[in-house]
Amino acid sequence: MNKDESRQRRARQTRIRIAEAQANRLTVIRSNTHISAQVYSPCGTKVVAAASTMEKDLRQAIKNGGNAQAAAQIGKLVAERAVKAGVVDVAFDRSGHRYHGRIKALAEAAREAGLKF
């Protein structure tokens, strides 16, 4: 089993646990150059709020989407949009990535902006 297969297995197990708990899910999608975050409804099919460094208006403000500062801005933005939609309590789905660097920056910014997880 290689590194990516291990990450995908961890992500699958996390998503199963979150689905059993019937909680809103804050999911992080990370690439080398961009980061995205989406808040899913408890059923897992409806996106309640989303933010990404690939959004046109954010690309002007964020020069490099692959660093911790960009991740923090995305975390703050997705949290504001989720709170506006009425979602405060979420389960954090880090997609099998370690809680470090960009993932940690996004999570801390989302907590500061009002999400609880």
From Swiss-Prot:
Name of protein: Large ribosomal subunit protein uL18
Instruction: List the molecular function annotations (GO) for this entry.
Output: 5S rRNA binding; structural constituent of ribosome
What Pfam families does the entry give? Answer: Ribosomal_L18p
Its quaternary structure?
A: Part of the 50S ribosomal subunit; part of the 5S rRNA/L5/L18/L25 subcomplex. Contacts the 5S and 23S rRNAs.
Question: Key word Transferase present in the record?
Answer: no
Query: What role does it play?
Result: This is one of the proteins that bind and probably mediate the attachment of the 5S RNA into the large ribosomal subunit, where it forms part of the central protuberance.
Native organism is Polynucleobacter asymbioticus (strain DSM 18221 / CIP 109841 / QLW-P1DMWA-1)
Similarity field: Belongs to the universal ribosomal protein uL18 family.
Q: Which domain of life is it from?
A: Bacteria
PANTHER family with a match to the protein in the record: 39S RIBOSOMAL PROTEIN L18, MITOCHONDRIAL, LARGE RIBOSOMAL SUBUNIT PROTEIN UL18M
Q: Which gene encodes it?
A: rplR
**Keyword hit for Signal:** no
